[in-house]
Protein backbone atom coordinates (compact mmCIF):
# COMPACT_ATOMS: atom_id res chain seq x y z
CA UNK A 1 0.00 0.00 0.00
CA UNK A 2 1.54 3.30 -1.07
CA UNK A 3 1.46 6.66 0.71
CA UNK A 4 -1.53 7.96 -1.26
CA UNK A 5 -3.65 4.88 -0.52
CA UNK A 6 -2.79 5.05 3.20
CA UNK A 7 -3.71 8.73 3.23
CA UNK A 8 -7.18 8.29 1.74
CA UNK A 9 -7.95 5.41 4.10
CA UNK A 10 -6.81 7.13 7.30
CA UNK A 11 -7.37 10.87 6.94
CA UNK A 12 -10.09 12.46 9.11
CA UNK A 13 -12.01 14.37 6.47
CA UNK A 14 -13.31 16.88 8.99
CA UNK A 15 -9.87 18.52 8.71
CA UNK A 16 -10.77 19.58 5.18
CA UNK A 17 -14.17 20.84 6.31
CA UNK A 18 -12.55 22.96 9.02
CA UNK A 19 -10.00 24.25 6.49
CA UNK A 20 -12.82 25.21 4.14
CA UNK A 21 -14.77 26.98 6.91
CA UNK A 22 -11.71 28.95 8.00
CA UNK A 23 -11.04 29.93 4.41
CA UNK A 24 -14.65 31.00 3.95
CA UNK A 25 -14.50 33.75 6.60
CA UNK A 26 -15.24 36.93 4.54
CA UNK A 27 -12.84 39.33 6.22
CA UNK A 28 -13.27 42.01 3.56
CA UNK A 29 -17.01 42.11 4.14
CA UNK A 30 -16.70 41.98 7.92
CA UNK A 31 -14.04 44.67 8.20
CA UNK A 32 -15.75 47.13 5.86
CA UNK A 33 -18.99 46.77 7.80
CA UNK A 34 -17.23 47.17 11.15
CA UNK A 35 -15.49 50.28 9.82
CA UNK A 36 -18.87 51.58 8.61
CA UNK A 37 -17.66 51.74 5.02
CA UNK A 38 -20.75 50.00 3.65
CA UNK A 39 -21.27 46.60 2.08
CA UNK A 40 -18.17 45.84 0.00
CA UNK A 41 -20.33 43.76 -2.34
CA UNK A 42 -21.96 46.99 -3.55
CA UNK A 43 -18.69 48.89 -3.98
CA UNK A 44 -16.39 48.85 -7.01
CA UNK A 45 -16.31 45.37 -8.52
CA UNK A 46 -18.33 43.90 -5.66
CA UNK A 47 -15.44 41.59 -4.82
CA UNK A 48 -14.70 40.94 -1.13
CA UNK A 49 -10.92 40.96 -1.59
CA UNK A 50 -8.36 43.50 -0.42
CA UNK A 51 -7.98 45.28 -3.75
CA UNK A 52 -11.65 46.13 -3.88
CA UNK A 53 -11.62 47.10 -0.20
CA UNK A 54 -8.94 49.61 -1.15
CA UNK A 55 -11.53 51.29 -3.34
CA UNK A 56 -13.31 52.46 -0.20
CA UNK A 57 -10.34 54.76 0.34
CA UNK A 58 -9.43 53.13 3.66
CA UNK A 59 -5.91 51.75 3.26
CA UNK A 60 -5.78 50.36 6.79
CA UNK A 61 -8.88 48.25 6.31
CA UNK A 62 -7.57 47.07 2.93
CA UNK A 63 -4.23 46.09 4.48
CA UNK A 64 -5.98 44.28 7.33
CA UNK A 65 -8.14 42.40 4.82
CA UNK A 66 -5.06 41.40 2.83
CA UNK A 67 -3.29 40.18 5.96
CA UNK A 68 -6.22 38.15 7.26
CA UNK A 69 -7.01 36.62 3.87
CA UNK A 70 -3.37 35.51 3.70
CA UNK A 71 -3.46 34.14 7.23
CA UNK A 72 -6.49 31.99 6.40
CA UNK A 73 -4.31 29.90 4.13
CA UNK A 74 -1.13 30.07 6.17
CA UNK A 75 -2.57 29.19 9.58
CA UNK A 76 -4.41 26.12 8.30
CA UNK A 77 -1.18 24.82 6.80
CA UNK A 78 0.96 25.63 9.84
CA UNK A 79 -1.44 23.79 12.17
CA UNK A 80 -1.45 20.70 9.95
CA UNK A 81 2.35 20.78 9.76
CA UNK A 82 2.69 20.54 13.51
CA UNK A 83 -0.05 18.02 14.25
CA UNK A 84 -0.33 15.68 11.27
CA UNK A 85 1.15 12.21 10.85
CA UNK A 86 4.56 12.45 9.11
CA UNK A 87 3.59 9.55 6.83
CA UNK A 88 0.98 11.50 4.89
CA UNK A 89 1.86 15.04 5.93
CA UNK A 90 2.74 16.30 2.43
CA UNK A 91 -0.62 15.33 0.92
CA UNK A 92 -2.58 16.51 3.94
CA UNK A 93 -0.89 19.91 4.02
CA UNK A 94 -1.50 20.49 0.32
CA UNK A 95 -5.16 19.48 0.47
CA UNK A 96 -5.84 21.48 3.65
CA UNK A 97 -4.40 24.57 1.96
CA UNK A 98 -6.47 23.87 -1.14
CA UNK A 99 -9.70 23.62 0.85
CA UNK A 100 -8.94 26.88 2.68
CA UNK A 101 -8.43 28.46 -0.75
CA UNK A 102 -11.74 27.04 -1.99
CA UNK A 103 -13.42 28.44 1.10
CA UNK A 104 -12.30 31.94 0.16
CA UNK A 105 -13.52 31.51 -3.42
CA UNK A 106 -16.82 29.86 -2.54
CA UNK A 107 -17.86 30.82 1.03
CA UNK A 108 -21.00 29.09 2.23
CA UNK A 109 -21.94 32.22 4.20
CA UNK A 110 -22.19 34.32 1.03
CA UNK A 111 -24.01 31.82 -1.18
CA UNK A 112 -20.65 30.64 -2.54
CA UNK A 113 -19.81 34.05 -4.01
CA UNK A 114 -16.39 34.93 -2.64
CA UNK A 115 -13.10 36.51 -3.57
CA UNK A 116 -10.60 35.69 -6.28
CA UNK A 117 -8.17 33.92 -4.01
CA UNK A 118 -4.91 35.77 -4.62
CA UNK A 119 -4.14 36.65 -0.99
CA UNK A 120 -5.14 33.20 0.28
CA UNK A 121 -3.03 31.63 -2.48
CA UNK A 122 -0.07 33.60 -1.17
CA UNK A 123 -0.84 32.54 2.39
CA UNK A 124 -0.91 28.87 1.43
CA UNK A 125 2.46 29.28 -0.30
CA UNK A 126 3.86 30.90 2.82
CA UNK A 127 2.66 28.04 4.98
CA UNK A 128 3.67 25.15 2.75
CA UNK A 129 6.96 26.36 1.26
CA UNK A 130 7.93 29.94 2.08
CA UNK A 131 10.37 30.40 -0.87
CA UNK A 132 7.33 30.04 -3.15
CA UNK A 133 5.72 32.98 -1.36
CA UNK A 134 8.88 35.04 -1.90
CA UNK A 135 8.83 34.24 -5.62
CA UNK A 136 5.14 35.15 -5.77
CA UNK A 137 5.77 38.52 -4.10
CA UNK A 138 8.76 39.32 -6.32
CA UNK A 139 6.88 38.49 -9.53
CA UNK A 140 3.70 40.29 -8.45
CA UNK A 141 5.65 43.39 -7.42
CA UNK A 142 7.72 43.49 -10.60
CA UNK A 143 4.70 43.24 -12.90
CA UNK A 144 2.75 45.76 -10.86
CA UNK A 145 5.59 48.30 -10.88
CA UNK A 146 5.84 47.94 -14.66
CA UNK A 147 2.16 47.76 -15.62
CA UNK A 148 0.14 48.94 -12.57
CA UNK A 149 -2.48 46.23 -13.10
CA UNK A 150 -3.26 44.25 -9.95
CA UNK A 151 -5.05 41.55 -11.92
CA UNK A 152 -2.22 41.06 -14.43
CA UNK A 153 0.31 40.96 -11.61
CA UNK A 154 -1.66 38.20 -9.90
CA UNK A 155 -2.09 36.18 -13.09
CA UNK A 156 1.61 36.25 -13.89
CA UNK A 157 2.52 35.42 -10.29
CA UNK A 158 0.24 32.36 -10.15
CA UNK A 159 1.74 31.21 -13.45
CA UNK A 160 5.39 31.49 -12.40
CA UNK A 161 5.05 30.20 -8.84
CA UNK A 162 3.99 26.61 -9.72
CA UNK A 163 6.90 26.39 -12.16
CA UNK A 164 9.29 27.34 -9.37
CA UNK A 165 7.68 24.81 -7.03
CA UNK A 166 7.94 22.09 -9.69
CA UNK A 167 11.72 22.35 -9.59
CA UNK A 168 12.28 23.02 -5.91
CA UNK A 169 9.45 21.48 -3.85
CA UNK A 170 7.30 18.33 -3.80
CA UNK A 171 4.87 16.99 -6.38
CA UNK A 172 1.75 17.25 -4.21
CA UNK A 173 2.28 20.95 -3.53
CA UNK A 174 2.97 21.60 -7.21
CA UNK A 175 -0.24 19.85 -8.30
CA UNK A 176 -2.23 21.76 -5.69
CA UNK A 177 -0.77 25.08 -6.86
CA UNK A 178 -1.58 24.32 -10.49
CA UNK A 179 -5.20 23.63 -9.52
CA UNK A 180 -5.34 26.83 -7.47
CA UNK A 181 -3.82 28.82 -10.33
CA UNK A 182 -6.52 27.54 -12.69
CA UNK A 183 -9.19 28.75 -10.27
CA UNK A 184 -7.50 32.16 -10.06
CA UNK A 185 -7.57 32.41 -13.87
CA UNK A 186 -11.24 31.40 -13.96
CA UNK A 187 -12.09 33.97 -11.30
CA UNK A 188 -10.24 36.60 -13.33
CA UNK A 189 -11.95 35.80 -16.64
CA UNK A 190 -13.63 39.20 -16.82
CA UNK A 191 -10.33 40.92 -16.03
CA UNK A 192 -8.58 38.94 -18.75
CA UNK A 193 -11.19 40.05 -21.28
CA UNK A 194 -10.71 43.68 -20.27
CA UNK A 195 -6.93 43.35 -20.40
CA UNK A 196 -7.13 42.00 -23.94
CA UNK A 197 -9.18 44.96 -25.16
CA UNK A 198 -7.31 47.55 -23.11
CA UNK A 199 -10.17 48.39 -20.76
CA UNK A 200 -8.87 46.94 -17.50
CA UNK A 201 -8.57 49.49 -14.70
CA UNK A 202 -5.29 50.11 -12.99
CA UNK A 203 -5.19 49.95 -9.23
CA UNK A 204 -6.44 53.12 -7.59
CA UNK A 205 -9.13 53.89 -10.17
CA UNK A 206 -12.72 54.24 -9.08
CA UNK A 207 -14.60 52.00 -11.47
CA UNK A 208 -14.34 48.27 -11.84
CA UNK A 209 -11.64 46.27 -10.20
CA UNK A 210 -10.13 42.82 -10.10
From Swiss-Prot:
Its EC number is 2.3.1.275. The keyword Hydrolase does not apply. GO terms for cellular component: plasma membrane. Signal peptide: none annotated. Belongs to the PlsY family. InterPro entries: G3P_acylTferase_PlsY. It holds the Pfam family G3P_acyltransf. GO terms for molecular function: acyl-phosphate glycerol-3-phosphate acyltransferase activity. The chain crosses the membrane at residues 11-31, 63-83, 90-110, 126-146, 163-183. Keywords: Cell inner membrane, Cell membrane, Lipid biosynthesis, Lipid metabolism, Membrane, Phospholipid biosynthesis, Phospholipid metabolism, Transferase, Transmembrane, Transmembrane helix. Probably interacts with PlsX. The gene is plsY. The keyword RNA-binding does not apply. It is found in: Cell inner membrane. Pathway: Lipid metabolism; phospholipid metabolism. It catalyses: an acyl phosphate + sn-glycerol 3-phosphate = a 1-acyl-sn-glycero-3-phosphate + phosphate. It is a multi-pass membrane protein. It comes from Bartonella tribocorum (strain CIP 105476 / IBS 506). GO terms for biological process: phospholipid biosynthetic process. Catalyzes the transfer of an acyl group from acyl-phosphate (acyl-PO(4)) to glycerol-3-phosphate (G3P) to form lysophosphatidic acid (LPA). This enzyme utilizes acyl-phosphate as fatty acyl donor, but not acyl-CoA or acyl-ACP. This is Glycerol-3-phosphate acyltransferase.
